[in-house]
A protein has these predicted regions:
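Primary mode marks residue(s) on the alpha4-beta5-alpha5 output face of response regulator receiver
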Residues: 19-45, 50-198, 205-352
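Fungal secretory targeting signals
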Residues: 1-21, 352
Length: 352
């Protein structure tokens, strides 16, 4: 739904003239305070996350385990994608100082998904080398939770929707120009929700499946340039999209001064600290085959599915109804949908 407005950004970043896109839904697996990438083994972790993907998600996510082989179900459309994707959670702060979790809206043409995210894997045509799919044990982090100002080489893109209709067509038209996108949380009331897209790096050093900071083994190329010599291997452009249902929180609940009332679970009211984690978990070599074939899959249509094998014969799909049945109970058990006196974990709100 939004991908064409982001194509220019991806093209410039990857210096490509044509790209191919896998776009699919991943409904909610669980929402809880666990972060096995940044805080492995810690229960609970400092702030709340929304998690989608395979049911092998756990407190530690031991990198020696191939989660593509250990997971038994996934919330994603592609039934061989047992990867896990997670981001911070958006909260509304009312004028009386209490907080409530903002739910997600399923994406256009993916409306059967129960909240969650839309996931994109993008590969260009005119690349100097093949696109190398990730390997078991690979993981990475995009963004920095502590940021309150723009981060060099990384952006989130936000869009404020005025409304949407019964067919989940959003206004303003998400296929339009990216001029309405911002790199910080919108400051106005968004009756159709707030969309946020988070982009992962596209270059890898070809050696390390992870590094202590979960970033140094990957890199963003300079705009219009190929991958740097330090990270010469081109990997798929992964980005994830969430639409937060901000319409439920009308202006009567906003702070009396009209200031922006939304804050991410790590205490970020700016949006610059929004971040995402990725742990690879595709089964077998399906993702590599899809990259080699430059598969294009944009929509998950109502059942029966009309893409794959036509869209990408190398990948297997499942109905969204089946995907929605894959879920986990909270390990770090705490309330999700009540009004709270503080952000989960008593995370302080910081502006710098």
């Amino acid at each position: 739904m939004l991908w064409s407005s982001l194509i220019a950004l991806v093209l410039v970043a990857r210096n490509a003239e044509a790209i191919h896109t896998l776009r699919f839904a991943c409904s909610q697996l669980v929402t809880e305070r666990l972060d096995p990438l940044v805080n492995p083994g810690k229960n609970p972790s400092p702030h709340m996350h929304q998690i989608v993907g395979g049911n092998a998600f756990n407190t530690t996510m031991d990198p020696s385990n191939d989660i593509g082989e250990t997971a038994t179900c996934t919330t994603c459309t592609f039934s061989e994608d047992f990867s896990n994707y997670w981001t911070a959670v958006l909260y509304f702060r009312a004028r009386n100082g209490t907080f409530k979790r903002v739910p997600q809206i399923a994406n256009q043409n993916l409306a059967q998904a129960e909240g969650g995210m839309t996931v994109y894997y993008i590969s260009p045509d005119n690349t100097t080398s093949p696109i190398t799919a990730f390997r078991p044990g690979f993981r990475m982090l995009a963004g920095t939770a502590e940021n309150r100002k723009p981060e060099s080489g990384f952006v989130n893109l936000y869009r404020c929707y005025d409304s949407y209709d019964e067919n989940m067509f959003f206004k303003p038209n998400p296929m339009g120009i990216a001029a309405t996108d911002t790199t910080e949380l919108p400051k106005s009331f968004c009756g159709g929700g707030i969309r946020v897209n988070t982009f992962f790096p596209t270059c890898w050093n070809g050696v390390d499946l992870d590094t202590p900071d979960h970033k140094s083994h990957v890199a963003y190329p300079d705009r219009g340039a190929p991958c740097p010599a330090t990270h010469p291997v081109e990997i798929p452009q992964v980005f994830i999209e969430t639409i937060w249902d901000t319409e439920k929180f009308d202006k009567s609940l906003w702070p009396e001064d009209g200031s922006q009332p939304f804050v991410f679970s790590q205490g970020d009211p700016t949006g610059y600290g929004h971040h995402a984690d990725y742990v690879f978990g595709w089964k077998g070599d399906g993702l590599q085959k899809a990259m080699d074939a430059r598969c294009d899959v944009y929509d998950a249509s109502p059942e029966p599915l009309i893409f794959p094998p036509e869209g990408c014969p190398h990948l297997k799909t499942q109905s969204q109804k089946v995907a929605n049945q894959c879920s986990q109970r909270q390990v770090a058990v705490e309330p999700l949908d009540e009004w709270l006196d503080a952000l989960p974990g008593n995370m302080p709100i910081t502006y710098s």
